Amino acid sequence: MIYDFAKTAPMDRYKLLAGCVVPRPIALVSTTDGKGGHNAAPYSFFNVMSHEPALLVLGVDQRRADIPKDTVANIRITNDFVV
């Protein structure tokens, strides 16, 4: 079957991509905000891309078009996160 992603609704693209990796591993990503508050959130869109150099990729969607999730907001403030 051929999917034309340009003509596929975002939620349908998500379902197709999420179904490509089963079972889906879950990473727990922890961050700290600028005031010292802590956040931990589960993410399934992550993977190791390379061992040399060591490269782990984390994909984070937004809540709405202009509001990032707390994880992204915290990473932008502190430049730190733990997977």
What is each residue range found by the language model?
Residues 1-83:
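N-terminal structural module
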